[in-house]
Amino acid sequence: MTEYIQDAIPAKLAIAIANPIFPQLDSQLRAGRHISIEMLDEHAFLMDFQTELESFYRRYHVDLIRAPEGFFYLRPKASTLIARSAMSEMEMLVGKVLCYLYLSPERLAQQGIFSQDDVYEELLNLADENKLLKAVNPRSTGSDLDRAKLAEKVGGALRRLARIGIITRVGEQNSKKFIISEAVFRFGADVRAGDDPREVQLRLIRDGEATTPTLLTTEAIEFAEDGARDELEESEAE
């Protein structure tokens, strides 16, 4: 039996699976997490065993992707055997704004640290406020309560993006400050085309193109099903 297993599994893949890093890393990838170079051990592990793990994940109908910026993630195919869920329009839009901030001069000026308020203010700056408020509440009158609900939605989107490695919290446990990972370019595939990156992001956000059905399909980030945890986090935040 042991000989059969050794014959069926390439030696280097067997070494990868036996590594103590693998179980937790595998769970993170399946839950939609992006593994950037800041995660030193996990990233080095994926670099060492990239070819073998690409073959391993293909069996589940998902692709292990290494983006041009160097981060890794799993991209499910339509026939995937791993449960998945797509991002909401608000999460996609907040991701686009984060990419815009990542490319901004302010990132260097602020030592790469942003806050939830920065994202909210930039979103109102770049997008049509009335459309945003209507998206949250179709009967919006532009009241302070409507704006509070929008801010709450932005906070929820940031929590989801933190969980998948797009941003990393800094400071105290409940801090609303964070740094943006290069994995934010999951939301900026279109900025690699050669045009000015900030201008491309700005156009997408201002013209309402950041969450079109086409972009939601082609750039969708998908997750393992963890809705129960989302609801718990949202209830704790209220």
UniProtKB/Swiss-Prot annotation:
InterPro entries, per database record: MukE_C, MukE_N, Scp_MukE
Its GO biological process annotations read: cell division; chromosome condensation; chromosome segregation; DNA replication
> Where are its TM segments located?
none
Kindly give the Pfam families that the UniProt entry links to this protein. MukE
- Keyword Ribonucleoprotein appears in the UniProt entry: no
As given in the record, the signal peptide range reads none
Which UniProt keywords are listed? Cell cycle, Cell division, Chromosome partition, Cytoplasm, DNA condensation
Gene3D superfamilies per UniProt: 1.10.10.2250, MukE-like family, C-terminal domain
Keyword flag Cell division: yes
Record's subcellular location: Cytoplasm, Nucleoid
Q: Name one GO cellular component term.
A: nucleoid
Instruction: Describe its partners and assembly state.
Output: Interacts, and probably forms a ternary complex, with MukF and MukB. The complex formation is stimulated by calcium or magnesium.
Function per UniProt: Involved in chromosome condensation, segregation and cell cycle progression. May participate in facilitating chromosome segregation by condensation DNA from both sides of a centrally located replisome during cell division. Probably acts via its interaction with MukB and MukF.
Family indicated by similarity: Belongs to the MukE family.
| Listed name of the protein | Chromosome partition protein MukE
